[in-house]
Amino acid sequence: MTVYHFVGIKGTGMSSLAQILHDMKHTVQGSDYEKRFFTQTALEKRSISILPFDKSNVKEGQVIIAGNAFPDTHEEIVAAKELNIPVHRYHHFLGDLMNQYTSVAVTGAHGKTSTTGLLAHVMQGAHPTSYLIGDGTGHGVENSKYFVFEACEYRRHFLSYNPDYAIMTNIDFDHPDYFTDINDVFSAFQEMALQVKKGIIACGDDEELQKIQAKVPVIFYGFGEDNDFQARNIQKRTDGTIFDVFVRNTYYDTFKITGYGNHSVLNALAVIALCHYENVDVEAVKHQLTTFEGVKRRFNEKPMGEQVIIDDYAHHPTEINATIEAARQKHPEREIVVVFQPHTFSRTEKFLDEFAESLSKADQVYLCDIFGSARENKGELTIEDLQKRIDGAELITDTTTDVLKKHKNGVLIFMGAGDIQKFEAAYVKEVQVAEK
């Protein structure tokens, strides 16, 4: 019996892939650092064993899958090579796995995870679908027709894939520690486009995506009239969003989604376009869109007394704009308060003015210290450089969260890609202690 051993199983993509193989009735185990990580819960539910790193974990007959974060000098990778066991890097293994199915890559600077989750949910309503989402969620079905997965542009990892279809949500400059400028980002997406085998579903409202060249049909979606799939007559309500879809200027159908903000309409439109192309029953699509509950760390909301707390992964100015817009649609009468932790010094420095502009759309802003990456030098930048660009912004630590209590009817959005959740947890604990 083949054992799949994951080196770095707690990584979001690795955890998802491990879940998929387990669901397909394979034997799966993995190793990682002992610090608890949010992806562990799904692994533990499946009784997938998580071991501390040790070269003795590697044994003959295993299939070794290594996370991209671990160098060839890692003790388990060295042990595998000493035993002449091939080591498969995560993205290469995933690229080979998807060839067994009709595969759909979801990529873009923003909206990948939400769109992947939505597409997987909708497709499941019509056909057996396996999926891998970048929030650490994976699900495998033995008789799958489709394989839906999130494909990341960072370090051009998505060039390991040759999917049947690709959804491209947008092209934007991010990851300044790797990409030099928007042209560098575009070149990565252009190269990816040439690897797609059947069709590309691209947001036609995005100026960069309009320039994409491909060997397969490119179907454009968006709000603009030149798009193949266009959303019109949009009704933004506090219980979701309703809109009409026109296909090449002909009315197709009316859809309701549970999401908020223009970005949620675009994500749904991409899914509708792909399903139309694959002849998925429109009634199934409509039903599934109304039952989608979202993905981890994307506008996850919970009430706490008179306040509402939202946990969100937004860590780029474009994403911050979208999250604040969504919060205002759902809670038009409430004060919008953002607690933001910038992620990486390189990104914060590159987009300092853009961060200030997007955060200023909230009614009140609290800033946490910058969450640095292990790969980077702190440099001269401090959180005060961002604070002085935002009127009324205050600094906050995980020991001073009690200041948030004064926003009695507020929507508190804890926002960031680092460890912002510890600030949220500290505040929740603060409130619970005060109530006793």
UniProtKB/Swiss-Prot annotation:
First-level EC class: ligase
Classify the main location.
cytoplasm
Report the domain of life of the source organism: Bacteria
Q: Which UniProt keywords apply?
A: ATP-binding, Cell cycle, Cell division, Cell shape, Cell wall biogenesis/degradation, Cytoplasm, Ligase, Nucleotide-binding, Peptidoglycan synthesis
- InterPro entries (alphabetical): Mur-like_cat_sf, Mur_ligase_C, Mur_ligase_C_dom_sf, Mur_ligase_cen, Mur_ligase_N, MurCDEF_pg_biosynth, UDP-N-AcMur_Ala_ligase_MurC
What are the recorded GO MF terms, alphabetically?
A: ATP binding; UDP-N-acetylmuramate-L-alanine ligase activity
On whether Repeat is a keyword of this UniProt record, the answer is no
Choose one Gene Ontology CC annotation of this protein and give it.
cytoplasm
Query: What SUPFAM superfamilies would the database entry show?
Result: MurCD N-terminal domain, MurD-like peptide ligases, catalytic domain, MurD-like peptide ligases, peptide-binding domain
User: Its catalytic activity?
Assistant: UDP-N-acetyl-alpha-D-muramate + L-alanine + ATP = UDP-N-acetyl-alpha-D-muramoyl-L-alanine + ADP + phosphate + H(+)
Pathway per its UniProt entry is: Cell wall biogenesis; peptidoglycan biosynthesis
Q: What is its EC number?
A: 6.3.2.8
Specify which residues bind ATP according to the UniProt entry for this protein: G108, A109, H110, G111, K112, T113, S114
- Provide one Gene Ontology biological process annotation: cell division
Its subcellular locations are:
Cytoplasm
Q: Could you tell me which Pfam families the record lists for this protein?
A: Mur_ligase, Mur_ligase_C, Mur_ligase_M
Family of the protein in this entry: Belongs to the MurCDEF family.
Q: What does this protein do?
A: Cell wall formation.
Protein name from the UniProt record: UDP-N-acetylmuramate--L-alanine ligase
The lineage is: Bacteria, Bacillati, Bacillota, Bacilli, Bacillales
Encoding gene, per UniProt annotation? murC
